UniProtKB/Swiss-Prot annotation:
Protein localization: Cytoplasm
Recorded name of the encoding gene: ruvA
Protein name per UniProt: Holliday junction branch migration complex subunit RuvA
Gene3D superfamilies, sorted: 5' to 3' exonuclease, C-terminal subdomain (1.10.150.20), Nucleic acid-binding proteins (2.40.50.140)
Keywords assigned: Cytoplasm, DNA damage, DNA recombination, DNA repair, DNA-binding
Region (Disordered): 133-155
């Protein structure tokens, strides 16, 4: 599974951009294209959608945005164009609407019917409630870690031992929970948790864990 492309944005239009990588150009449709700049070197998370007639690559600014896109298109009647339209309203805004069971506001998004909005909330409300809770916990832990590092730098407190094991345990628990929500099996998750290196950026931690699972021979079909 290819997770992202890294390259230079050589052109952008209203709905898509062209990313150059090792002499090849990739046409990628993205939501909220204003976030991407021409001549910028950028990592873009990708999803390749293929049917009997076409193969289109969609790109995202973050891995979490890619996950949300996949969830949206898993709903019958919601295609990639509708999912991109929904993401144009903002990823976090969309997550908050789903988590809050606000299908009425969701249904106001262009191309998204009331029926589909209700189904999205029905399928994913609990998941995105947990996503928000995990994000909140991770932010609090990151702030706590920063404060602890400041104490280590600025204060001569040799007699104080700052406990980091709880932070590590919570991060591992959040990672495990996220991988479960993404559909990975317990054996795959356990393997990733034993191999992944610590990373202060939780999204990078998820990405690295998925790479480990994808590259493991025992989990290949």
């Amino acid at each position: 599974m290819q997770i992202y492309q890294f390259g230079k944005i050589v052109s952008k239009n209203k709905n898509y951009l062209i990313l150059e990588n090792h002499g090849s150009g990739y046409l990628i449709y993205v939501p909220r294209i204003d976030r991407f700049s021409r001549d910028e070197n950028r990592k873009i998370y990708i999803y390749e959608h293929e049917n009997d007639y076409t193969k289109i690559t969609y790109g995202f600014a973050s891995f979490r945005e890619r996950i949300l896109f996949e969830d949206l298109i898993s709903i019958q009647g919601v295609g990639p164009k509708t999912a991109i339209s929904a993401l144009n309203s903002g990823m976090q805004n969309l997550i908050n609407l789903i988590a809050a069971n606000d299908w009425k506001t969701l249904a106001k998004i262009p191309y998204l019917s009331e029926k589909n909005a209700k189904q999205i909330v029905f399928e994913f409300q609990k998941k995105y409630e947990r996503f928000n809770e995990n994000h909140k916990n991770q932010t609090e832990e990151t702030n706590q870690d920063s404060q602890e590092k400041e104490l280590e730098k600025n204060d001569d407190l040799a007699d104080i031992t700052i406990q980091k094991s709880n932070l590590e345990d919570k991060t591992a628990a959040n990672l495990e929970d996220t991988l479960k929500m993404l559909g990975f099996k317990p054996r795959q998750i356990d393997y990733a948790l034993t191999k992944v290196e610590p990373n202060e950026n939780f999204e990078n931690l998820i990405e690295n864990a998925i790479k480990i699972i994808s590259n493991a021979r025992e989990f290949r079909n």
